[in-house]
């Protein structure tokens, strides 16, 4: 019977005994994804993709639709949770050398790009003051790319300005991309289970494995319940913590908000974009900031997989984390003397981590050889 085979497949899946809590974020991402699709469905049912009605339809959802306020807040804060989990998930992969599962890592990076595309499209759907400016900026950045891009932008967003067609296109994109994410996630999991997970020691764990159920199911459930608790507490008590005051006024193409800044989870990429004075160069740096993750499996030169036993690499990694935080912070600030310099230095350091990655590995190999 197929369902029994499935139960055996997942229940008796052999997993290393020593994987830590950093390995729980994958299942949390799956839960986030499911929740976003469900809440998004209920929001889309009541949403109107028209430039004149979009903002009013969202006000209608939060005020008149039963539990609409809850759907909207769960969807918005759920997206923040999604990004917190995915950034931790990626940091875990970098730290413990999980990127050496090449197929899994490449499919995961593609997933990240799709997730960012979905989140960006959802921002434009609200047609609030910050959203119109963000959509215009995104269209302008895309148009900067090449000669052909202007036509591509017109095809995707229907017009250069954020008109009714653009809202409809964004709503449709935000509706279909999550299904792509779900399909790719299943591929990601299948590719992962070809080789199995890594572990904190970065060693082969074939000699010491336990069944996924009940051990890791309950372990996953613990972190999942903590995440749900955090989510519900935030939705209940601080629903606008990640929100921008500009989102409470309707989009007006004639009035630009004082500080156009995206959601916190894009600030890091936005900071890198802003730190390059050239328009095309900025768009390129923005794309590269994500694409550079694809290089890690090919630039790993160390004989050791995990950073647990690589002190120099640990220093580099935590510098990278600090750099990420600094870029995120600097991107919230206006474009003025101290902040521009901070952004540029931090962005350079971000890219330097990936560039010096192979050299650090070779240096560590040499040091180990002499000891």
UniProtKB/Swiss-Prot annotation:
One of its GO terms (molecular function) is ubiquinol-cytochrome-c reductase activity. The keyword Cytoplasm does not apply. Binds 2 heme b groups non-covalently. It holds the Pfam family Cytochrome_B. GO terms for cellular component: mitochondrial inner membrane. Belongs to the cytochrome b family. It comes from Eryx jaculus. This is Cytochrome b. A ubiquinone binds at residue 193. Heme b b562 binds at residues 75, 174. Heme b b566 binds at residues 89, 188. Its cofactor is heme b. Component of the ubiquinol-cytochrome c reductase complex (complex III or cytochrome b-c1 complex) that is part of the mitochondrial respiratory chain. The b-c1 complex mediates electron transfer from ubiquinol to cytochrome c. Contributes to the generation of a proton gradient across the mitochondrial membrane that is then used for ATP synthesis. GO terms for biological process: mitochondrial electron transport, ubiquinol to cytochrome c.
């Amino acid at each position: 019977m197929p369902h029994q085979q499935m139960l055996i497949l997942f229940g008796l899946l052999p997993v290393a005994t020593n994987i830590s809590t950093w390995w729980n974020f994958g299942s949390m991402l799956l839960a986030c994804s499911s929740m976003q699709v469900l809440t998004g469905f209920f929001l889309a049912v009541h949403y109107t993709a028209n430039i004149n009605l979009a903002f009013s339809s969202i006000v209608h959802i939060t005020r008149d639709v039963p539990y609409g306020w809850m759907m909207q807040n769960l969807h918005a804060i759920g997206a923040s949770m999604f990004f917190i989990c995915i950034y931790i998930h990626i940091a875990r992969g970098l730290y413990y050398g999980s990127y050496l599962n090449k197929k899994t890592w490449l499919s995961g990076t593609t997933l990240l790009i799709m997730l960012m595309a979905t989140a960006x499209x959802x921002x434009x759907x609200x047609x609030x003051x910050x959203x119109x400016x963000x959509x215009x900026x995104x269209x302008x950045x895309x148009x900067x790319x090449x000669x052909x891009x202007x036509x591509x932008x017109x095809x995707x967003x229907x017009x250069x300005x954020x008109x009714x067609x653009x809202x409809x296109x964004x709503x449709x994109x935000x509706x279909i991309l999550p299904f792509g994410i779900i399909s790719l996630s299943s591929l990601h999991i299948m590719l992962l289970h070809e080789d199995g997970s890594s572990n904190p020691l970065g060693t082969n764990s074939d000699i010491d494995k336990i069944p996924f159920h009940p051990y890791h199911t309950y372990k996953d459930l613990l972190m999942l319940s903590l995440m749900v608790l955090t989510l519900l507490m935030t939705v209940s008590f601080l629903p606008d913590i990640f929100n921008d005051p500009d989102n409470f006024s309707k989009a007006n193409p004639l009035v630009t908000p004082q500080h156009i800044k995206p959601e916190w989870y894009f600030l890091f990429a936005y900071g890198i974009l802003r730190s390059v004075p050239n328009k095309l160069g900025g768009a390129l740096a923005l794309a590269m900031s994500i694409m550079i993750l694809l290089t890690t499996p090919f630039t790993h030169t160390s004989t050791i997989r995990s950073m647990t036993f690589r002190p120099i690499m640990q220093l580099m990694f935590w510098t990278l984390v600090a750099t990420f935080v600094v870029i995120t912070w600097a991107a919230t600030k206006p474009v003025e003397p101290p902040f521009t310099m901070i952004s540029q230095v931090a962005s350079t350091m971000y890219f330097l981590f990936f560039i010096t990655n192979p050299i650090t590995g070779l240096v560590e190999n040499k040091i180990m050889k002499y000891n």
